[in-house]
């Protein structure tokens, strides 16, 4: 089921999401929500979707960077961003640690701020400790584009948007970026 993606200005995007219990994660309601979030993310299309973006103030996000999303990028762009295919997965109740001092600055967009992008500085490497969709512990060490996606989605779970971190003078409509 495709869900409606809420847009900036909706108060749910500024709330810290509630953590889910193991029982909640395993419930049929949350499992159905995960499926709907996956379908919604793919339909948008996007590389991540956090529960607050569909109006649910809980600590849950889905992530996937499919081959068809990156097929038009040049080898240079993929290398510069350290971007590759990321299989579909779920993060629940994540805790993030920034690793090292290295950072990267690239344009980011958001399904909840349709039609705009801006340059956002992000840590180059992160470690995320969370639970997966089966409520099993998961540790993710990520760098490059994957680290950026994780930071973006975890920001959503904590009531933050990329516009809180962006270089404001780079904020632009997508059609202006393309030209």
Q: Where are the regions that the model predicts?
A:
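Active-site rim/adjacent substrate-binding subdomains
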Residues: 1-151, 156-179
